[in-house]
Structure formats: structure tokens, C-alpha cells
């Protein structure tokens, strides 16, 4: 039997999961390469044999996506599998055209081929775009379940930017664990808000192994929470699917892959940030939910912002630092830091571009929609150095940190700074407390010691 030669087109996340679940032990296929994009410096590596399995004793090479047409011809590729997220339909089909023009088939794997089934109840928190507020939603879900005396284990969508073997299964229980695993800023932004609240987070590369460890976590496990990445759908089959939408990008819920998959398969659709969006934009999003997911429960929510030192913003010339991926491939022009600056009466939000150095100059050149805000890029040591130098070069009176982590703990900032925190605050009913109360009863998770609370 002739095996089909496969290239998996990815960005160090969904691509590895698709391989592990669908291709690793499938003798009908030979995965000859991965390609990589979106994340700096991940091409030129190898998916190691220890993870690739017995059919791949040499491992699998990772190339830049730019080389795709040549690779298809040189490696006699039959099919290319698209496996990354937060990308417009136009760009997905452009990749498809490149693949077809080189002679290969173009393929997308769906949930039935890639989702793992847990022996614990699973709640997934996903989104239609990156930067919609998944993390604050996940925190709200966890905190609500904890009030019912339930043990919740969060499992985060992968961000394996380092040693893949060492990152096969990662467990984070303390901030020190983040240092132990040499986490990038992007990883810390997702893990730290959980562990700072005393919650356990798992992540890594092999999600079958991760799920098995999470289910038997030494601290106990009643519920698995899938904490999604970008706008990808869950790696685990959910018993309750929650999808977050952003009225600052109305219409994107029907235009970006695979966010529309999340929307069409969701049980609960949360329209976040309604306090900072126009009524017209909120209505567009609500109409699209009713069109694509008519049976889902719609919840509207504010992204409630609190500032540690508001006096450092009012009347000051400020530099705003925001979450990197939200601004870059998420295509946002602002975030919580910008909203805080506007609400608290900053004298001026400065343009950071004249002060940018190194890799940040490249980021601004690539993502030209980013203007009066600095993306916190920190995938590697050089980017961290460039971020620190850019902030310290800036002609401003204060720095607003709108990232989920405390940047001043990671880099040295030579100006007064203040952090912005943001939390999900639902408006009216139904809300997450109502939804989760039903979930707890349905899965017979009620404990005698639980205290039931009602918010809003």
C-alpha cells in the first residue's frame, strides 16, 4: 500500500495536536513535514522522534510556510492539512490556492477527527477571534465552580515554543513553575492569571498525555476546563461549550477560521466588552449569533477594568502596552490599557513607533494597523530585550501595562507604571452562575459543602 505524503501547515499548536491524534499511528499516511508561521523562530526545528512515535524514528522537519510550493514538489506531497487559527477565510483559501497550484489536495480536519474524550465533565471556553476575553471568562467559570467546592483543572491550548520533548506535559501550580519551564511572555500571559489565583493549569504538546495527567491530578479533579487559544476549537470534547465574541470586531465571527466553527457548535455565546462598543456593533454580533447558532444562549457582558494606580494616568502623557497577539494577528488597534487611558483622562497616548528597536520595528512594519500602542512581544530573549529598550526609550510620563501579566516583573522599566486588570461582568440574566448551576446538577457534581451564590 502506497502511503499518502502529508504536510501539516501550522504554527506550533493545532498542527502537532492534529498529527498526534490523527496521523501519528496511521499507516495510511506519511507526514513528511510541518510548516510554521505566526510565531517567530519556530521554523527550522524538528518535531522529535520521541513525540512523533514509532513510525517516525527520525522525527519530522519543520519548515517555513514560505517554502510550501517547493516542499510539495520536492517531497511529492499528496495532501496539505491546514492547522492553525485566527486567519481570515480569504487567507485560508489563498493558502489553499497555493497548495492546489502546486498539485496537492487541501484539507481541514474537524472535531470528530481531533477531539479527545475525557472521563471528567469538560467545559470549553473558546472564541471567534483572539483577544475577545477568553481568559477572563475562564477565570469566571473556575471561580464560580470553586464556590461549589469543585476541583477544577484548566488545560490551556498549546504554545510550545521551546524544547518540545521537555514540554510534552507541563503542570503549572505556582509562579515559580513558570520560571522553571522557561515560559515566554505569551505563555505567562495565559498561565499566570490562573496560578496567581491558586488554580492548576496544564499545557504542552501531547494532549492525550496531558488529559490523562489532568484527570488524575494530585490536587483532585472534578471538572476539566479547556482554556482555548486564538479562535481555535477545543482539543477535548466539551459537555458545555462557551464561545466569546467581540463587538469591537463586528462581523469577524463569520469571517475567520475556525472561529465560526466555535460559534456554530457553542451552547453559550458571550458578547463581551459591550460597555466599550457601540450599540450598532453589539447588535451586528447578536444578529450573527442568531443566524449561525440559533439554539445557543446569549449572554452580554462588560469587561470590567480596574487600575492599580489611576493617579499615574490622569493628565499624563502615557505609553500603552497591550497583549501582543491581540494586536498583531488579532488585528485590534487597542486593548484594556487604551480604554483605561481614555476613561481616566490621560493627557496623551503617545505613538511608540519612533522609539521602537529591533524586532519591534519589524512588528510595526508587518502589522501597519498598530499605531498608538506597543504590542508586548516576548516569544524569546531578543524580543524581551527589544521590548524593554523600546519602553525605556519612550518619551512619556508613565507606562500603562494592559497585558495579563506584570511586565515590570519580567523587564526593567525606568518610568512609573501601572497595571490594568479586567474581569468579566455579565449583565442581567441568564448569566454564567445560572448556566453553571444547571451544568453542576446535570453532571451530578453537587457537594454537600458547596455554597451556592448568585451574582449580578
Language-model regions: role of each:
Residues 1, 117-118, 313-315:
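Short, flexible coil/linker segments at domain boundaries that flank nucleotide/cofactor-interacting
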Residues 2-75, 348-361:
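A solvent-exposed beta-alpha-beta segment
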Residues 132-133:
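Conserved glycine(s) of the Walker
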Residues 9, 126-127:
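Residues at the beta-strand->loop junction immediately N-terminal to the Walker
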Residues 5, 75, 124, 136, ...:
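Flexible phosphate-sensing "switch/lid" loops adjacent to ATP/NTP-binding sites
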Residues 114-122:
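Phosphate-binding P-loop
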Residues 49-112, 384, 393-406, 411:
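Phosphate-bearing ligand-interacting subdomains
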